[in-house]
Amino acid sequence: MAPSRRDLQLTPVTGGSSSQISDMEEVGLLDSYHNEANADDILTKIEEGRDVSGLRKIQVGVTGMTCAACSNSVEAALMNVNGVFKASVALLQNRADVVFDPNLVKEEDIKEAIEDAGFEAEILAEEQTQATLVGQFTIGGMTCAACVNSVEGILRDLPGVKRAVVALSTSLGEVEYDPNVINKDDIVNAIEDAGFEGSLVQSNQQDKLVLRVDGILNELDAQVLEGILTRLNGVRQFRLDRISGELEVVFDPEVVSSRSLVDGIEEDGFGKFKLRVMSPYERLSSKDTGEASNMFRRFISSLVLSIPLFFIQVICPHIALFDALLVWRCGPFMMGDWLKWALVSVIQFVIGKRFYVAAWRALRNGSTNMDVLVALGTSASYFYSVGALLYGAVTGFWSPTYFDASAMLITFVLLGKYLESLAKGKTSDAMKKLVQLTPATAILLTEGKGGKLVGEREIDALLIQPGDTLKVHPGAKIPADGVVVWGSSYVNESMVTGESVPVSKEVDSPVIGGTINMHGALHMKATKVGSDAVLSQIISLVETAQMSKAPIQKFADYVASIFVPVVITLALFTLVGWSIGGAVGAYPDEWLPENGTHFVFSLMFSISVVVIACPCALGLATPTAVMVATGVGATNGVLIKGGDALEKAHKVKYVIFDKTGTLTQGKATVTTTKVFSEMDRGEFLTLVASAEASSEHPLAKAIVAYARHFHFFDESTEDGETNNKDLQNSGWLLDTSDFSALPGKGIQCLVNEKMILVGNRKLMSENAINIPDHVEKFVEDLEESGKTGVIVAYNGKLVGVMGIADPLKREAALVVEGLLRMGVRPIMVTGDNWRTARAVAKEVGIEDVRAEVMPAGKADVIRSLQKDGSTVAMVGDGINDSPALAAADVGMAIGAGTDVAIEAADYVLMRNNLEDVITAIDLSRKTLTRIRLNYVFAMAYNVVSIPIAAGVFFPVLRVQLPPWAAGACMALSSVSVVCSSLLLRRYKKPRLTTVLKITTE
């Protein structure tokens, strides 16, 4: 089934206590860094006794943002609305999140606030956990970090909104909100009130379906379809767009399923209507394409009108006939002046209307953005030219006009924005490739009585339900996560796990949606669909990272907040400085243009300063790089959960490894068994296996597998494990009771009403079990050879010892050496005994070892290393590693590990390969280097270009930068930054053969 855009890491919002508010802030993986202050505000309100449980949160698409100043503008506009508690804006995603009190402010008011700020807004989507929904919205018009901050600020302060994140790179906003307090329309309105375009992309509501309907040819067809929907049981409400054929249906899932709903519509329409479930990515892609197309149309329109201006200004004066026509006086002006005025007016106020609208809304909201600079620069050129014409008509003194500067400036800015939209689209290529892994359709097998297959039909993959039996042809993609029920084949899982070798699949083998069936036909039963599917969760993690803000983004946000006022101030100084210089004779009149004045000469410098300055490049420097890097990481099997984690990893000083399952393969095998009692070997193994059958620890599974093989000479499963449930039902194991797993020690339970202990020395000591010297010597010999000695005591007496070996991963030693070459110090922290730990550490080349450490103690080790400000990474795979993963600055969970470990980590290594630890750190370093280069370019561009535009070098070079050329430079600067980030797509992960060439950075 096609993946959802959401992960399942959100918790319900119940409100009422500070702890609850704190929890919901902590689990919000998409929260940007400035959520903290808002959380404090809410906590303060709780302490004051004010109820915040009724707050609502909306997510809106904001159109019109072009730079960081825009997002700051939208955010400020929303924060100024009474009743808005929190707002956040993502510039690249054109998205805003708002938290507000519906008793004080309505969604329409928030939308109007964004529109009043000069942007268009539209509700995007909503998602439901238990008490909240999460909606995703497109936000059009964002161009820089200021736009993002503005939209985010508005959305976060909306009552009922729990979390809001807006991303510039994808023009998306995500809002988690209480649907009882605020709805999606209110969120869209908030975005539009901020001056951006917003629309709903998708919802995680289980009772909502968006369909594309083919077959609506006229009004009668639409009425027939509406009649069918009205009669269908379970349909609560629907909305049909008769022009686009898009149908949105809200239904009761307890009455009718989504597939039954689609089947019912098609059957009642007697085949006239064909319905297809619309993927949220499809809807989003169409919006992105539409925005780029709209920008292209604007550019072409402006270009078509600018070309005649160029001919009138440059070519025609050299052609006698045309020159005569242009200087022919028609009323108070010459024909050429009339033509230029008319053409430029269309460009200025029709094609360039968007700049005025966005600038006005931003200014009205007390903020500034790139649109303000463009509107100011073009208006100065246009209205000066109009004034010069009117002044000439009245006085007879004709000054030069600069209509062409205004027109060409708008044309070049539109070209730059079009190129920028294309470049930004490239940053999401990795996400698009992940989405395309899911097939559009699936073959559903229908069953008759007794489970006999009676037929098959093709259905939309988005309509697959858990329990469906599906047929997968050779070469086809697996349509959903599930289990093979018939057939055998090899499946290529490289696109999901990064593992290049095809994996054998037989009956009861799990399969992952989006992977490719290589050879034989398979029948599978779907188990996980929608947001539960592996591919969906991968996409959700990538999307989460792309929506988040890296801490380094704070710099761009600060600069964006002061950028435009500083530029306007510099432009005024330029105008005044050159004007005064001319008045006092500081420069010769020969510098002036023909028929020009000192004011005109100064004005051109001032306009160039205004239009050459570019806040967009700064706003795009970080989010575009983060977006590309997270996508590249996903394609290489490294899932990064956020910009914060991506940034922290570049300065990792220590990497802490767990031993079992991390440095080792996690495929423990029993190599030695020695009985120190009157029991025979079979009795002993049955006793130990019975005790360990209830444990999920790798060592326990190894013991059970060994005992089974001893009794039945059976082969274990492919991964060295056996099915404990089957073992318990097989009859050869003894009944147990009072089972307890003791982390860091072992297990204990009752067998035949007698206590059995299986574990290490600590467990024996705590239970007063004496270990004779000859047994201790035997255990020490095992440990010194790198094996784990498991001691067994029964009914108060030691009865035997088992030696278990867990082979090291083949790449472990090389990865450790690679980390040392990178300037990173590896440390092994394990709950195993010191002798085994030292033996394993020596084999892989780790000098710093911490053994016999309890799970909570691992977190203490990390905190001790963090005391001097060092950045610590933790690599683990088990539940007992989750406290350490959470305590580390950068937690890395092995993908084959437990869900708890993956949940606590910042990175997920899908391949279960330690080589990806180096990839994660190396990718982080490359990304931060690229971000710094982007900032250097963006800052250097403004630092160098503004003085040039102001004429600082004019006395030496005698070259004045025309306003249109300044506008072209400005437009191309942001495109250059995006293209710089796109270079990260060429990233190649370090290979085992080259990893040792990595040097310290």
UniProtKB/Swiss-Prot annotation:
The top EC class, named as a word, is: translocase
Where do the segments described as Disordered lie? 1-21
Q: Which residues cross the membrane?
A: 299-320, 339-358, 366-386, 404-424, 559-581, 603-620, 932-951, 964-982
Annotated positions binding Cu(+) 1: 67, 70
What molecular function does GO assign, one term? copper ion binding
Query: What InterPro entries does this protein map onto?
Result: ATPase_P-typ_cyto_dom_N, ATPase_P-typ_P_site, ATPase_P-typ_TM_dom_sf, ATPase_P-typ_transduc_dom_A_sf, HAD-like_sf, HAD_sf, Heavy-metal-associated_CS, HMA_Cu_ion-bd
The EC number(s) this enzyme carries: 7.2.2.8
Q: Which residues bind Cu(+) 2?
A: 144, 147
Those parts of the protein on the Cytoplasmic side are: 1-298, 359-365, 425-558, 621-931, 983-1001
Kindly give the membrane topology term recorded for this protein.
Answer: Multi-pass membrane protein
| Compartments (UniProt record) | Membrane
Which residues are exposed on the Extracellular face of the membrane?
321-338, 387-403, 582-602, 952-963
Pfam families xref list: E1-E2_ATPase (PF00122), HMA (PF00403), Hydrolase (PF00702)
What keywords would UniProt list here?
Answer: ATP-binding, Copper, Copper transport, Ethylene signaling pathway, Ion transport, Magnesium, Membrane, Metal-binding, Nucleotide-binding, Repeat, Translocase, Transmembrane, Transmembrane helix, Transport
Q: What's any one GO cellular component for it?
A: trans-Golgi network
Where is the sequence biased in composition, kind Polar residues? 11-21
The residues that hold Mg(2+) are 877, 881
One of its GO biological process terms is: regulation of stomatal movement
Catalytic-site annotation from UniProt: 658
**Catalytic activity line of the entry:** Cu(+)(in) + ATP + H2O = Cu(+)(out) + ADP + phosphate + H(+)
Domain annotation HMA: ranges: 56-122, 133-199, 207-273
Q: Which family does it belong to?
A: Belongs to the cation transport ATPase (P-type) (TC 3.A.3) family. Type IB subfamily.
Q: What role is this protein assigned?
A: Involved in copper import into the cell. Essential for ethylene signaling, which requires copper. Acts by delivering copper to create functional hormone receptors.
Which named protein is this? Copper-transporting ATPase RAN1
